[in-house]
Regions:
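A short C-terminal helix-loop "cap" of Rossmann-like NAD(P)-dependent dehydrogenase/epimerase domains
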Residues: 55-57, 171-174, 198-209
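N-terminal Rossmann-like NAD(P)+-binding domain of SDR-like oxidoreductases, especially those catalyzing
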Residues: 1-183
């Protein structure tokens, strides 16, 4: 198998960031096969994906949750690269339904990391969040900034982040942890800050911070 013939498992690939990434690698790597696992919550939409992808033999979609260990193990075993976007990702929602966040973000990540530990892959990329840092104590912030999450969502992401790190140390999984700061782009849900600001501005409403 050459570099251009990988099978990539992407969780949460129908969401905002995940779908942009799926579309990108589908176009850039013509021989990559893509397996997409997504629960299709309110934030996931298969219409975010390129129309031609859905008819391609390079693409397979599985409707499921990362907490479902059996399907996760099955799909990881078929993959060389695993990229984990799937998560509940809204600070305010996490305040009112924090159980869902800890189940999806922490237990779901554990299921995936367990599968990677048992079915070795070439790379496991975990998408964390800058929310794990809390309020900035240094300028600029870097990876050495202490983790001080300020919401249930941030705490769940911090838990998943440290879980993956522990698996890198304990089981030597080939993991990378990415902590993106505020993202903006196509397919972003209107509950997020920048789309909300744009809609408010178009309606001549005040921009509430």
């Amino acid at each position: 198998m050459t570099f251009n013939e990988k099978t990539v498992l992407i969780t949460g690939g129908a969401g905002f960031i995940g779908s942009n990434f799926v579309n990108h690698i589908y176009k850039k790597y013509a021989k990559y096969k893509i397996i997409l696992l997504d629960a299709l919550t309110y934030a996931g939409n298969l219409d975010n994906l390129l129309p031609e992808m859905k008819q391609s033999d390079r693409f397979r979609f599985f409707h499921g949750n990362v907490m479902h260990g059996d399907i996760v193990k099955e799909l990881v075993a078929q993959s060389q690269i695993v990229i984990h976007f799937a998560a509940e990702s809204h600070v305010t929602r996490s305040i009112y339904d924090n159980t869902l966040f800890f189940e999806t973000d922490v237990i779901g990540t554990q299921m995936l990391a367990n599968a990677v530990a048992h079915h070795p892959v070439e790379r496991f990329i975990h998408i964390s969040s800058s929310e794990v840092y809390g309020t900035a104590e240094t300028d600029p912030m870097d990876e050495n900034h202490p983790l001080k999450p300020l919401s249930p969502y941030a705490a769940a992401k911090a838990g998943a982040d440290r879980l993956v790190y522990s698996y890198i140390q304990t089981y030597q999984i080939p993991g990378i942890i990415v902590r993106p700061f505020n993202n903006y782009g196509p397919y972003q849900h209107i509950e997020k800050a920048i789309p909300n600001f744009i809609i408010s501005a178009l309606q001549d409403q005040p921009l509430t911070l």
